[in-house]
Curated annotation (Swiss-Prot):
Homodimer. It catalyses: (S)-malate = fumarate + H2O. The lineage of its organism: Eukaryota, Discoba, Euglenozoa, Kinetoplastea, Metakinetoplastina. Gene3D superfamilies: Fe-S hydro-lyase, tartrate dehydratase beta-type, catalytic domain. GO terms for biological process: fumarate metabolic process; malate metabolic process; tricarboxylic acid cycle. One of its GO terms (molecular function) is 4 iron, 4 sulfur cluster binding. This is Fumarate hydratase 2. It comes from the Eukaryota. The keyword Cytoplasm applies. Its EC number is 4.2.1.2. Transmembrane segments: none annotated. (S)-malate 2 binds at N219, K220, A221, Y222, L223, Y224, Q225. The gene is FH2. Belongs to the class-I fumarase family.
Length: 568
C-alpha cells in the first residue's frame, strides 16, 4: 500500500462524529477579537454631512430586520469628495504639531523655518486650487460594510469612479504606472488603479478610511523579522535608536511615527503599522490580555518621541522636531516569529474618515482655516539669514559661490533650474550607453528632482515640490564625470556615493524643504517649459524659472554632509 493510499484511508476514517467529539473537548472556547478599540466607529471624530446626501439612502425591512439600501452613486460622490478634501485640508493635530515647533524655545531655527513654511503652504492649499503636495499619491480605501448595507455589489467600480473624478477634475498628479511587460511601463493617465480593501462587518452602516499615500512616505514602511531576543527594554530601545535613523528625511518630517511589535503574520504587522500612522487605532486599550488583544503602549510611545527628539535630525535640516507624535502597538505573535513594522505619515498626512448611514453621507471635518495656527512671531525669529544665489551666471561661478559656505547654510535660488526625475534620468543614461553625449541642459543649470501636479488656469505652475533625492544617487558620479549635474536639488538625505562624487568632481547637493509644494508654485516658480520627453507627462524634463527658491547646502564640494553625524 502506498503512502498516498494510507493517507486517503486515514482521511476517510475521520468523520463528522470525530469532529463533534473533538469540539466537545473545547468546552471553554472563548472568542476574543484582536482589535478592541473603545471607539470603533470614531464617534470622537467630527463629521460633516454631505448636503443632500439623504436621497441616496433608504431603510428597508428584510426578514424583520432594518437594512440600509444605498444607491451606489453615493460611493462615487463620497470618494470624489474625500480625495478632494484630503489634498487641501489637514487634521487639527497635524497643524498643532507645526505650531508647537514654531513656539518651542528648544526648537532649532531650521525647525521653526520648516514648520512655518509648511503652515503657510497649508494656507495656500486651503484655497482648493493647489494641492498641498505635488505627489498626490496612490488612492487607498479601507471600507467596512455592514452585513445589512446593500449597495448592489459593485463597490470597487463606483469608488474607483469617484477617485477618477477627483484626479481628473482637480489639479492632482497622475502617478500610477502600468506594466506592459516585465520592464516596459506607461502612466495610466488617471491615477488608477486604486488600492481597495473592503470588509464585511455587523450592522448596516458603511465606514471608510481614505488615504492618499505618496511615494516618499510609502517607501519608509519597513518590515523587520526579529526574535524573542528583541523583547526586553535594553534591546528594544537600541533597536528603536538604530531604526529611526534609517527613516532619514526623504519622507518630509516632522513625521507621525508608528511602530508595531508582533503580528500573526508579516502582512498583519504591515497593515497595522500603516493604519497606526493614520491614528486609526488610537482608541485601542493600553494593556494586553491572555487572549492576545492588541494594545497601545504609551510608555514606549514616549520613548520613541524621546529618541526622535534627541536624534538631532529635526524637521529635515537639524533640530528637535523629527516627529509630531508616535504610536506603538503590541500584537500577538507566533512563538517562532517576531515581525516588527515601522512606518510614517509624512508632512502631507492625507487621510480622512467617512461613513454612510440611514441619514446620509458623512465625511470627517478637516480644518479649513489653517491660518489660525500661524503664530504672531516676527519672521526674523523664525529663520536664519539666507544667501542669495544667482543661477543666471555660468554654473562654475555658482559653484564657486556655494563653496564659500558651510553645509547647513540656507540659500535662496534665483534663475533657471532643470527638472528631471527617475524616468528622465534612466532615458538620459540609456542615450549615453548608446554613445550619445550628456544633453547640454544637464550641464548649464542645477538639476531639480521633481515632477509637477497639473497647472491650474492662471498659474505658472501646479504644485511642484521636490521628490526623494536618493533614487537618483546612482547617476550622480556618471553625470558629473561628463560635466553635468554639478548641483542637484531635491529632498532628503543621500548616500555616501553622492558625497564622494561631489568631492571628486566639485559638486553640491542642495536640500529643498519637502512638503510645501503649493507655496513653491505660488511664490517661487514663475515659468515652466517642457524641454524633453513630453510623452512622459510629469516625468518629462522641464525648464523652470524661480525666484527666492529656498534650499540648504547639504553636501558640498569638500566631502561634507550635514547629515553625517545625525544619521550615522
Amino acid at each position: 500500500m502506498s503512502l498516498c493510499d494510507q493517507c486517503e484511508i486515514g482521511c476517510r476514517r475521520v468523520g463528522i462524529k470525530d469532529i463533534e467529539d473533538a469540539s466537545a473537548v473545547n468546552a471553554d472556547f472563548h472568542f476574543s477579537a484582536i482589535f478592541q478599540p473603545t471607539d470603533p466607529h470614531h464617534h470622537q471624530t467630527e463629521f460633516a454631512k454631505v448636503e443632500g446626501s439623504e436621497k441616496y439612502v433608504e431603510e428597508v425591512e428584510v426578514f424583520g430586520r432594518q437594512a440600509l439600501k444605498v444607491n451606489p452613486e453615493a460611493l462615487t460622490i463620497l470618494a470624489h469628495r474625500a480625495f478632494s478634501d484630503v489634498h487641501h485640508f489637514f487634521r487639527k493635530d497635524h497643524l498643532e504639531g507645526w505650531r508647537r515647533a514654531i513656539e518651542d524655545p528648544e526648537a532649532s531655527d531650521n525647525d521653526r523655518y520648516v514648520a512655518t513654511t509648511l503652515l503657510k503652504n497649508a494656507c495656500i492649499a486651503a484655497g482648493r486650487v493647489l494641492p498641498s503636495c505635488q505627489d498626490t499619491g496612490t488612492a487607498i480605501v479601507l471600507g467596512k460594510r455592514g452585513e445589512l448595507c446593500w449597495t448592489g455589489g459593485e463597490d470597487e467600480k463606483y469608488l474607483s469612479k469617484g477617485i477618477w473624478n477627483a484626479y481628473r477634475y482637480h489639479n492632482l498628479r497622475y502617478s500610477q504606472t502600468a506594466a506592459l511587460d516585465m520592464f516596459k511601463e506607461c502612466n495610466t493617465g488617471d491615477n488608477l488603479p486604486a488600492q481597495l480593501d473592503l470588509l464585511a462587518v455587523p450592522g448596516s452602516d458603511y465606514e471608510f478610511l481614505f488615504i492618499a499615500k505618496g511615494g516618499g512616505s510609502a517607501n519608509k514602511a519597513y518590515l523587520y523579522q526579529e526574535t524573542k531576543a528583541l523583547l526586553n527594554p535594553k534591546s528594544l530601545r537600541a533597536f528603536i535608536e538604530e531604526k529611526l535613523k534609517t527613516l532619514g528625511t526623504a519622507a518630509c518630517p516632522p513625521y507621525h511615527i508608528a511602530l508595531v511589535i508582533g503580528g500573526t503574520s508579516a502582512e498583519m504587522t504591515m497593515k497595522t503599522v500603516k493604519l497606526a500612522s493614520c491614528r486609526y487605532y488610537d482608541s485601542l486599550p493600553t494593556t494586553g490580555d491572555k487572549y492576545g488583544r492588541a494594545f497601545r503602549d504609551p510608555e514606549w510611545e514616549k520613548i520613541v518621541m524621546e529618541v526622535a527628539q534627541k536624534s538631532g535630525i529635526g524637521a529635515q535640516f537639524g533640530g528637535k522636531y523629527f516627529a509630531h507624535q508616535a504610536r506603538v502597538i503590541r500584537l500577538p505573535r507566533h512563538g517562532a516569529s517576531c515581525p516588527v513594522g515601522l512606518a510614517v505619515s509624512c508632512s502631507a498626512d492625507r487621510q480622512i474618515l467617512a461613513h454612510i448611514n440611514k441619514s446620509g453621507i458623512y465625511i470627517e471635518q478637516l480644518e479649513q482655516n489653517p491660518a489660525q495656527y500661524l503664530p504672531d512671531i516676527p519672521e526674523v525669529h523664525l529663520s536664519t539669514t539666507s544667501v542669495k544665489v544667482d543661477l543666471k551666471r555660468p554654473i562654475d561661478k555658482v559653484r564657486q559661490q556655494l563653496s564659500q559656505y558651510p553645509v547647513g547654510t540656507r540659500v535662496m535660488l534665483n534663475g533657471t533650474l532643470i527638472v528631471a526625475r527617475d524616468i528622465a534620468h534612466a532615458k538620459i543614461k540609456e542615450m549615453m550607453d548608446n554613445g550619445e553625449p550628456l544633453p547640454e541642459y544637464m550641464k548649464t543649470s542645477p538639476i531639480y528632482y521633481a515632477g509637477p501636479a497639473k497647472t491650474p488656469e492662471g498659474y505658472a505652475s501646479g504644485s511642484f515640490g521636490p521628490t526623494t533625492a536618493g533614487r537618483m544617487d546612482s547617476y550622480v558620479d556618471l553625470f558629473q564625470s561628463h560635466g553635468g549635474s554639478y548641483i542637484t536639488l531635491a529632498k532628503g538625505n543621500r548616500s555616501k556615493q553622492v558625497t564622494d562624487a561631489c568631492k571628486k568632481h566639485g559638486g553640491f547637493y542642495l536640500g529643498s524643504i519637502g512638503g510645501p509644494a503649493a507655496i513653491l508654485a505660488k511664490d517661487s516658480i514663475k515659468q515652466v517649459t517642457c524641454l524633453a520627453f513630453p510623452e512622459l507627462g510629469m516625468e518629462a524634463v522641464w525648464k523652470i524659472e524661480v525666484e527666492d527658491f529656498p534650499a540648504f547646502i547639504v553636501v558640498d564640494d569638500k566631502g561634507n554632509d550635514m547629515y553625517s553625524k545625525t544619521l550615522a
